[in-house]
Amino acid sequence: MRDRLLDGLNNAMRAISSKTTIPILTGIKLDVTAEGLRLTGSDADITIQTFVKTEENGKQIINVDEPGSIVLQARMLHEIVRKLPTNEVEIEVTTGLQTIIRSGKSEFHLIGSDANEYPQLPEIANNEQFSIPSDLLKTVIRETVFAVSTSE
């Protein structure tokens, strides 16, 4: 789970700015459901969400004891997860938004923020979505980046 969690954190953290006027946006929102873990990072202009499924290729990745949400400081969470000794990770949120992260013999305590304070994302209708292969998207960006303004 650590590797999947770290990948998700790396993706979501790309949207987080250390210079923000909204303090909760220095954190990553973790939403756990029976389907999996959704990680959300935002700077109020750009938001990145990534999803880790509970099961992949018939293999259990995440065990969900109880669904819930919390916002944890992104940089601190990333450093902790990156340095965890084993791939097994347990994240427990207790009363008062106290969060305990365990892996092997290591245990870390963080104070989280209420996920309800995190800005809501606008809902996007399914008919406005499309898929594009990543290599094609990279090519399109590479061939058009010269036209991007370097100043606002």
Question: What role is predicted for each listed range?
Answer:
Residues 1-152:
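Structural preference for solvent-exposed beta-strand-turn elements
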